[in-house]
């Protein structure tokens, strides 16, 4: 590897603010904020959505049936092309 061209890879804390969950993982993201976690200071980044708060992963997503969508379309625009 060439010296001086690669970003600084380090442990960073990501905070999902909507679920109040902290993730400590490796990243090259740049930030000026820090947080102390378990006695160690880490770079700190806030995020809005993670697997702890996204409806797909939490099982709270809404299911839409295709039949309902088709029927709704036909009801609105079915006579338009006749």
Swiss-Prot record:
Source species: Pectobacterium carotovorum subsp. carotovorum (strain PC1)
GO molecular function: structural constituent of ribosome
InterPro entries: Ribosomal_bL28/bL31-like_sf, Ribosomal_bL31, Ribosomal_bL31_B, Ribosomal_bL31_sf
Disulfide bonds: none
Keyword Cell membrane: no
HAMAP family for the chain: Ribosomal_bL31_2
Protein name stated in the entry: Large ribosomal subunit protein bL31B
Assembly and interaction partners: Part of the 50S ribosomal subunit.
């Amino acid at each position: 590897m060439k010296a001086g061209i690669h970003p600084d890879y380090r442990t960073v804390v990501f905070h999902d603010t909507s679920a109040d969950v902290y993730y400590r993982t490796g990243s090259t993201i740049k930030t000026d904020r820090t947080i102390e976690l378990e006695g160690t200071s880490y770079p700190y980044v806030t995020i809005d959505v993670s697997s702890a708060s996204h409806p797909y992963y939490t099982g709270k997503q809404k299911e839409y049936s295709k039949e309902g969508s088709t029927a709704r379309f036909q009801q609105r625009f079915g006579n338009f092309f006749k």
